[in-house]
Every structure is written in structure tokens, then in C-alpha cells.
């Protein structure tokens, strides 16, 4: 059975991804930060599945990432964890950087140290393109992997 770890499982995309992977027969480890409030409202389907395990963890904790990846030995790791409010990124740029940029690096450093490396997916936002857009031959606007980055906030980095 394939095993996947989802950082940021309590967000909208994380909850949808956990349901999808469970439907595909995966064992899913959903990682959520410790919180003073119950942040599992988006997980009613996943929480009732025997192949889903909710794990407390944080992308800013390299030792915790190492322990989890070493014990689970996942086939896939998804990083959807983020400080996802643009305005908050201006108010707390260091915290945003620690979660969005260093958090990704922390996961990648652990993966790099593993003998059998899982596939890795890093979620992002169109905010990284800022006001850069490309146009197709019909004049329609789009952004893709060739669009130049032009972040306008700490969140977008």
C-alpha cells in the first residue's frame, strides 16, 4: 500500500487531497500544527477512515520532520503548509518566511538524506507571479511555469 504524508492537511487543499488519496487506496498521514482550537473541521471523511492518521507536526521543526519521514517511509510527500494570508505576511514576514520557505527546505533536506527518496510536491500560489501575465495568440491572459516571477509580498516568495 502506498504511503503519503500531507503537511497542511487541515487546509482546504489538504483535506481534498487526503480524501482523494484515501480513495486511491493510500495510507495517509496528515500533519497539522498543534493548535488551541480544533482545526479538523474540513476532515470529517478522512478522520473516519482507518487508513488516515492525523499527526501533530510543524514544517519549522526539522527533527520532527526527520522522525516522521524516517518512521513512515512515505512514497509521496505533499507540502501544503503555509501562512496563507497576504496581509499577515506583511505583519509577520519572519514567521511567513520560516513556514513557506524554510519549511519547504526543511522537508527537502530530510528527503535528501533518505536512502529511498519519496516524490515531493510543493504547493504554491499565483501570487508569486505578482502582476506578470502572458498572453496567448487570442489575447487571453495566462500564467504558467515560464511566466516570470514578480512577488509583491512576503507570502508570494
Model-derived segments and their meaning:
Residues 1-157:
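N-terminal Rossmann-like NAD(P)+-binding domain of SDR-like oxidoreductases, especially those catalyzing
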Amino acid at each position: 500500500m502506498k504511503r503519503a504524508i500531507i503537511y497542511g492537511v487541515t487546509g482546504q487543499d489538504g483535506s481534498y487531497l487526503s480524501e482523494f488519496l484515501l480513495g486511491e487506496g493510500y495510507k495517509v498521514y496528515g500533519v497539522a500544527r498543534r493548535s488551541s482550537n480544533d482545526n479538523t473541521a474540513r476532515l470529517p471523511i478522512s478522520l473516519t477512515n482507518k487508513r488516515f492518521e492525523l499527526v501533530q507536526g510543524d514544517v519549522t521543526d526539522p527533527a520532527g520532520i526527520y522522525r516522521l519521514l524516517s518512521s513512515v517511509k512515505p512514497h509521496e510527500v505533499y507540502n501544503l503548509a503555509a501562512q496563507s494570508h497576504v496581509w499577515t505576511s506583511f505583519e509577520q514576514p519572519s514567521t511567513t518566511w520560516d513556514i513557506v520557505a524554510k519549511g519547504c527546505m526543511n522537508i527537502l533536506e530530510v528527503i535528501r538524506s533518505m536512502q529511498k527518496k519519496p516524490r515531493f510536491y510543493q504547493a504554491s500560489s499565483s501570487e508569486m507571479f505578482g502582476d506578470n501575465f502572458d498572453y496567448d495568440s487570442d489575447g487571453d491572459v495566462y500564467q504558467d511555469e515560464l511566466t516570470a516571477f514578480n512577488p509583491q509580498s512576503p507570502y508570494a516568495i
